[in-house]
């Protein structure tokens, strides 16, 4: 998987700075105007109160109200802010490939953020729980004692125990004007000294990410930096805390010639151009969404901030009055014309059989395929080779709908090898597989649809064989261990959906003789369920529904032979 690579974070940052320089503008004077307005107009006794709230181990709806009220006061005092501007990007704003790339990355970002906010890392609770999870947790804490450590940790478990977790959205994150005002007023220093100190941090940021060792050296020259906390930043406790990242961001706003990402201003007129430029840099630098829970890499951070609001200051403006998340406020319209693609014949000379269905059978298949929503995540997987597939599965996790069909192989020797080492299907079980069904299904996939796969090469070859070059395949690139993480549970819960994998699977001999190799057969449908389970962190929780009737999958067998 891509996230196994070492991420060259600062190189990515420099590349993004260079390519997006035309969208940056000098902001020092505007930031200082807002900082002075906050320093003069904000009640800092309320700031101190909210800072105490953020240090509490358990925070309630009342505490959240205090934070939201103070954020509203700050927003009212500022000129630099992001506006609620929901954007739908369509063909014309970006080309087809860019739209699909953006849609895929926003979906991955959504899943990453969700996993991060639910992962207790380093003893610090990192986010929101559902109401049912809150209830279970409350009962658990009552029975076990709140202060008892639940995980090995030297940190403090910080909990937002609120009825509506969506009220937490966009209430955190640092704002340079606020950081400067708080350092000035609460640090008892002059704003001029604070600006000089933060400028030094900003200059250092042009060549590296400043760390705590750098901070210690600079604090010897700028006493006002002593206020910066040495604690590691965590999700949902920032905003009014004096973190190093907040100070660095503030320092970046003072560098007019540094092409800093922090000084980007987004407008409805330049939004799609900025996104297009970002996707271009991503492609050249091989950037990606690292789906492991944790801090965002530079590309993820920029994409999240840009897509949160289509108008304003993505990094440094007040965002507390913006509702929704990035993947909600910026959406991609991939289904302007969800017309079905042509039923293209296979190319001559390849080992894919073409057989015709009856009109009634075609009508049933068309009815089933009409229930495939082109805007939903759609997994695709096959067993067999791309030019001689024996099983095809499509699965949409949002609805639980799936398509599963079979095909008699042309290459029996290759099939038996695949059966022994992979799918465990038996030739006798596929003798009566409905001819032409697999090809007809591929031909009915909606035009320009985005498909999700674990390993895309064979899928792309299969689609190309059927003349479906319009279809986009997104490869999640899970490691082999990750992909099979839910294998046992998925087979236990859903094995009854696929009864054609009855052979014995023997792992291929390898030099390292890995004892962990699975002997479970590979089923196209169950593999799709496993891959989605890895992303969700649990097996499917909804009822699965086959869109094709069982009677259509195989030809009728005679009751007796003459």
From Swiss-Prot:
Encapsidates the genome, protecting it from nucleases. The encapsidated genomic RNA is termed the nucleocapsid (NC). Serves as template for viral transcription and replication. The increased presence of protein N in host cell does not seem to trigger the switch from transcription to replication as observed in other negative strain RNA viruses. Its EC number is 3.1.13.-. Its main location: virion. Pfam families: Arena_ncap_C, Arena_nucleocap. Homomultimerizes to form the nucleocapsid. Binds to viral genomic RNA. Interacts with glycoprotein G2. Interacts with protein Z; this interaction probably directs the encapsidated genome to budding sites. Interacts with protein L; this interaction does not interfere with Z-L interaction. Interacts with host IKBKE (via Protein kinase domain); the interaction inhibits IKBKE kinase activity. Keywords: Capsid protein, Helical capsid protein, Host cytoplasm, Host-virus interaction, Hydrolase, Inhibition of host IKBKE by virus, Inhibition of host innate immune response by virus, Inhibition of host RLR pathway by virus, Interferon antiviral system evasion, Manganese, Metal-binding, Ribonucleoprotein, RNA-binding, Viral immunoevasion, Viral nucleoprotein, Virion, Zinc. One of its GO terms (cellular component) is host cell cytoplasm. Mn(2+) binds at residues 381, 383, 527. Residues 54-237 are annotated as: Binding site for the cap structure m7GTP. It is found in: Virion; Host cytoplasm. This is Nucleoprotein. It comes from the Viruses.
